[in-house]
Amino acid sequence: MKIIYVDLDGVVADFDKGRSEHPLSGVTPYIGRPDKLPGVYENLAPIPNAIESVNKLLKDSNFKVYFLSTAPWDNPEAWMHKRLWVAKHF
């Protein structure tokens, strides 16, 4: 069995779109630090076809799939929101 690590941001979750549409994205102190935007990870849209692609891997017994991501240490809600995002979509 092969192991596959799947990143979230920019791979299956559209962080760039979520960042640009966030109401505080142009407000100090978030300029240049979009990862600190409150709730930015909570409602990210999936990247087109990403969910279907990962689901194919999850159903294939030849692969063990793990989601691999990180969040800023000083944005503790980001860890929870990323976990909830995975649970919602997979």
Which residues are covered by each model-predicted region?
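Short, intrinsically disordered, charge-balanced linker/junction segments flanking boundaries
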Residues: 88-90
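Active-site neighborhood of HAD-like aspartate-dependent phosphohydrolases
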Residues: 1-44
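General N-terminal targeting signals
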Residues: 29-30, 82-84
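Substrate-recognition element of Asp-dependent hydrolases with the DxDx(T/V) motif
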Residues: 45, 50-80, 86
